[in-house]
Amino acid sequence: GKTTLVNAITGFYPPQKGRIVLEGADITAMKPHLVAKRKVARTFQNLALFNGMSVLDNILLGRHVHLKPSVAKTALYWWLGQPEEIAHRRVCEEIIEFLQLQGVRDEPVESLSIGLKKRVELARALVAEPAFLILDEPMAGMNQEEKEYMARFVLDARDERGITVLLIEHHMDIVTGICDRIMALNYGEVIGTGLPREVVANPRVVEAYLGKGRQHAA
């Protein structure tokens, strides 16, 4: 259900019924590129990076929603095109520093660990300057130290940049530790929603995520 939710919000799957409203605007039937222009960005459960490109080049791709190409900028590159290019690069360099990627900025993505690749995906999403950020299992495949780093970066992005974050995760300790509200899904069905302490105490959530035996033991 979570992948369907993400794809419905971002315009890849049209919902069969209901509406998707973002900041008062109905985006239900909106094309993905138009959703992105409404300051929605995402990361992917399965890494969607260009392995043959450097970390910096992958991150720069996130600026595509802000590009405004024109014949004039091409013809008068030194006066019109270059200043815009420098401005985009400045945003990327700031995010690289924010996510502590300076040491690998020029490395090919394929040479990085899973944890660093996930951080590059987050950087690419953040350079789009989103108001709504969707993170699809950003900690999958990470060790505990990498998870803690990523959790800290997500919290900093939310608090310092005023971003609303939709975090999709199976690690309940991470979810309960950093989320303000939780919605638990079981095969597309909402089985619990509310504050973290309310959701983890919900019998249906306990049964779905821990199993009946663990529920009775608790």
What are these regions (language model features)?
Residues T3-A218:
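Glycine-rich phosphate-binding loops of nucleotide-dependent enzymes
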